[in-house]
Amino acid sequence: MHTKLKNGACFVTEAEKKELKSSTMKRVMIWLIATFVCSASVCNAQQGDESAMGYPQAEWLRAGDILMHTPGQELFNGVIHPAAGLFEDYFDVDKAAEEHRGYIEMLQKNGIRVHTVRDILDEVGIDSLRVLADNELIYDISGIPDVDADESEAYRQEVLQKMSRGDLIRCILLQPTVKLSKTDNNTGYEAQYIQNPLMNLYFTRDQSITTPRGHVICNMNSSQRAPETSIISLCYEHLGLKPILRIEGDGRLEGGDYIPAGTVSLIGCGMRTNDEGIRQLMEADAFGHDTVVVVRDHKLWQMQMHLDTYFNIIDRNLCTMVSSRLNAQLGEPEFNTCDIWARKPGTKEYALWKQDQPFVEYIRSRGFEIIPIDYDDEMHYANNFLTIAPRHIMAVGGQSEELQRRFADAGVTVEWVPLESLIDGYGAAHCMTQVLQRETTGDTVSAIVSTANDANVTDTKAYSLDGRRLQGKPSCADVYIDNGIKVVNK
């Protein structure tokens, strides 16, 4: 007998369920002991409580699945006025796409399964695409009040029903508005065509976060980026992942401000994430850690808009920080403070334990060695690297010899990624990735599955979402991990 687990993503036998339950209970007991010691006090041990589900307990664990988006036509409108597009400078759209594809290839060579937004949009049901496109295609008839609104809407729906998959995707990414006016010539209509394309979608770090408990859909600080979350939500649905929370109302949350760190969650509060967003996360028990450290940014500078632009983690006892923050003195805008929230093991409600603590001191008290990132390297996005395994990072190429030496002295393997065009969008290797799962202990494989129509399973090396080897072939079409690689069954 095969039973579908609650997450809807994997199938295991009854015997496997009993084995999994037993091992899970052991992990829970270990977690309770570790959390009791660490969550309400500063812990130097840096235990990495690693979830059986593969959700990242810590930034330094081996990456298994990553969601990315290779930019396309939607990028052009952003580069013709970079500031309005939330970009730093003009950059070549075609070169940027080429760089992004190269980055994906480098990740895949490390055994990472990369899921792209465009591939997912090419796979989902066309009705799902039509729902998204319906929200984005606008007929503006305000300039012709004598036109019947119901007739105009019926015409719009008729066009949407006829649209091909490719054109529905263009509607979703370009967000077109047709501003209509009347004329006596030709068809009787003229139009001004306006686009509000999702030029920042390639920064897939920001629309969601992945905590030890699961996935959270963010509420973006910039209104022009708000529609991106609907696309990412659809991607999660297609991958068989159900987000546990969506930030709403006045709450603001962007993924670049969140870093899981073993027994604690680090969350930045500043330009893009606010206290209300953090409150919603804690109230919903979405962090999955008994200690939450709110890192307060007092500088509010675009170049350091998120926590991951000035602080990052390489291993359980090694991190980086830009020199201006590392060396800042109390009272200077670069000086980060942090508030530490904690709760008793087994309880839900957090309480403020310590407030306005020096962030650098806190990090060092937890046993981290800090590699400084000097100004010139910071301006080249050196701190915005992606950790794909302990002391193994993907970082923007072209950094100083001094920084290269610092990494080498710390035993860090660095793969230098050519991202010269893409970084002019105000982000780099970390910003362009959303790590959906990181491997658990041992040699298990964590893999995201894709919802599919019918199965064609030819390999017995199949794994469930929690990384457990399945005996024989999966019995259903919506779970299929072939030798650790996602297979899309059409």
What are the residue ranges of the model-derived segments?
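Residue-level detector of functionally pivotal "anchor" positions at catalytic/ligand-binding pockets or at interdomain
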Residues: 443-466
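Sec/Tat signal peptide C-region and signal peptidase I cleavage site
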Residues: 41-45
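The feature marks the mature, well-folded catalytic cores of soluble enzymes
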Residues: 46-442
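Bacterial N-terminal signal peptides
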Residues: 31-40
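C-terminal tail/sorting-segment detector
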Residues: 479-490
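Bacterial N-terminal signal peptides that target proteins for export
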Residues: 5, 18-31
